[in-house]
Curated annotation (Swiss-Prot):
Heme binds at residue 356. It catalyses: 2 flaviolin + 2 reduced [2Fe-2S]-[ferredoxin] + O2 + H(+) = 3,3'-biflaviolin + 2 oxidized [2Fe-2S]-[ferredoxin] + 2 H2O; 2 flaviolin + 2 reduced [2Fe-2S]-[ferredoxin] + O2 + H(+) = 3,8'-biflaviolin + 2 oxidized [2Fe-2S]-[ferredoxin] + 2 H2O. Residues 1-11 have a biased composition (Polar residues). Residues 1-20 are annotated as: Disordered. This is Biflaviolin synthase CYP158A1. Pathway: Pigment biosynthesis. Changing residue 90 to I: Normal activity. Reduced affinity for flaviolin. One of its GO terms (biological process) is pigment metabolic process. Keywords: Heme, Iron, Metal-binding, Monooxygenase, Oxidoreductase. It comes from Streptomyces coelicolor (strain ATCC BAA-471 / A3(2) / M145).
Amino acid sequence: MTQETTTLTGQSPPPVRDWPALDLDGPEFDPVLAELMREGPLTRVRLPHGEGWAWLATRYDDVKAITNDPRFGRAEVTQRQITRLAPHFKPRPGSLAFADQPDHNRLRRAVAGAFTVGATKRLRPRAQEILDGLVDGILAEGPPADLVERVLEPFPIAVVSEVMGVPAADRERVHSWTRQIISTSGGAEAAERAKRGLYGWITETVRARAGSEGGDVYSMLGAAVGRGEVGETEAVGLAGPLQIGGEAVTHNVGQMLYLLLTRRELMARMRERPGARGTALDELLRWISHRTSVGLARIALEDVEVHGTRIAAGEPVYVSYLAANRDPDVFPDPDRIDLDRDPNPHLAYGNGHHFCTGAVLARMQTELLVDTLLERLPGLRLAVPAEQVAWRRKTMIRGPRTLPCTW
């Protein structure tokens, strides 16, 4: 990293701002990020862990430009201790998140068939069956029920496990590992133990599926390894983040339901116009802050100009999809939830070649959860005052920890 960075206009670079990991009780926007957005389109930040500082892009057009620009890469991030949110950082070979082209496309091809629109459409009846069984359970027992524990957690686990090809007997163990990996509360040692457990299990599973013709992800990876298209280490590194991905659906929908349960006008709108829920879900996806801070950095592979500022080769850059989704130049009155907002080109699932692999699957699960809970629980409401709902702490993915409801 360069010792001094100057703008192309000769002005001094923006100051480096500390960005602590905040535990926010509720869906409110991160106040530090809001301040950084006001400061300018390109700022510099220092996160709780790692070394040095990084650039932060918050404007919609800049976020799209950077995430589409091959002059910014991810592969080098794995070799450096860049300033970051997570206390532990040991990426594995094969992870799509850190692959640059052409490796990214080669790896993604190995599993793409499991995440197509067609594959997701075929899965939908089975997913609905799983969800109906969970709702049947809480209806049989009667209210109150914690929707996070009883529905929002087990449903994505079961659906992702169907897609991945996880045997039913292993599903709870796999979920326990994923929970520990994405938490920031257990420390590096606990996360590393969970990673060893999960990736050891994945290695055994991929080996066992060698030569398989199945349509699940582990069978696809076993077959791809057998054909020499990906290495075993790459297959394991590719599968891990896909297995963990169900956590995002749990907590995104948890935030959506919290908003509907605490803002009567939103719930009324969703119930009165079920045919327009697709547009409404897009707006909720745009508005919610699905994560703490920012995700994964990129490295400038050569000098790049952004907003009149020279980002030097070797300097790290973060983009904020949360900030981009609140850009007033793209989303008028961006802090207001407008369930009729159209067009709504939100970036909730990312952008560029790192666009979420499971976006179609995640969207399908989100639609089923919201539709089914609203239709089968017509009197759905919180069982406790809103301020008593516990929110997740020391974690990268935001959302209510519990959602006690009655109906």
